[in-house]
């Protein structure tokens, strides 16, 4: 059986850059196929409608809906429209979602969710953020989410839904993930060296804190001379988080203890810990 996995990418968060790639890292899985429909950078109604129309036409077994602030009207409307068409949805979004009144409704709903607390909003002030700064920030953030283990936990949660479809479940019978990616959850089981573990955990805590600094710089501070250094400091925080992650991974390399968990062609997840060995 080939499982059809849809990815509806609405706007951008770092997790959305990697969503489908985490499921098929070498593009050789034979048990699944993915289709991504994107609204581009914006969340306008016409952009959302285009994504929903294309996704319904493809007819996935389930759909991953990735967006910032998952309780905004656009992302909320998209998943509700897909659900009405009989397509189960897993929401991947940032921690801003949990600060809104609608969070309780999402938790109690039929939708799955993965809240990436470390996937913090960018410092979106024109005086600071140009295309290169944007790309640099996302590169640092992707490294933090990768090395801490947050992306692995996200990938496994989605793989488990694929496994259920392969086992014959569908629609409302699917057990969808309901996961809040805290620092403890992200780093769990990822490191053998306790100092590497501590560095990675510190990195994720810093990455989470970046959101609050950028909220202050983007929405709570007037005057470019005041808000520009605030958002710049948030980006420096993310860079330091990335450097901590690099240090943690190098420590694991030094003792030949980097954990690798690739997919086989049939989607089975295997694992290895020493570099010169076969995954089992």
From Swiss-Prot:
<comment type="pathway">
    <text>One-carbon metabolism; methanogenesis from CO(2); 5,10-methylene-5,6,7,8-tetrahydromethanopterin from 5,10-methenyl-5,6,7,8-tetrahydromethanopterin (coenzyme F420 route): step 1/1.</text>
</comment>
<keyword id="KW-0484">Methanogenesis</keyword>
<dbReference type="GO" id="GO:0019386">
    <property type="term" value="P:methanogenesis, from carbon dioxide"/>
</dbReference>
<dbReference type="GO" id="GO:0030268">
    <property type="term" value="F:methylenetetrahydromethanopterin dehydrogenase activity"/>
</dbReference>
<protein>
    <recommendedName>
        <fullName>F420-dependent methylenetetrahydromethanopterin dehydrogenase</fullName>
        <ecNumber>1.5.98.1</ecNumber>
    </recommendedName>
</protein>
<dbReference type="GO" id="GO:0008901">
    <property type="term" value="F:ferredoxin hydrogenase activity"/>
</dbReference>
<dbReference type="InterPro" id="IPR036080">
    <property type="entry name" value="MTD_sf"/>
</dbReference>
<keyword id="KW-0554">One-carbon metabolism</keyword>
<dbReference type="Pfam" id="PF01993">
    <property type="entry name" value="MTD"/>
</dbReference>
<comment type="similarity">
    <text>Belongs to the MTD family.</text>
</comment>
<comment type="function">
    <text>Catalyzes the reversible reduction of methenyl-H(4)MPT(+) to methylene-H(4)MPT.</text>
</comment>
<dbReference type="GO" id="GO:0006730">
    <property type="term" value="P:one-carbon metabolic process"/>
</dbReference>
<dbReference type="InterPro" id="IPR002844">
    <property type="entry name" value="MTD"/>
</dbReference>
<keyword id="KW-0560">Oxidoreductase</keyword>
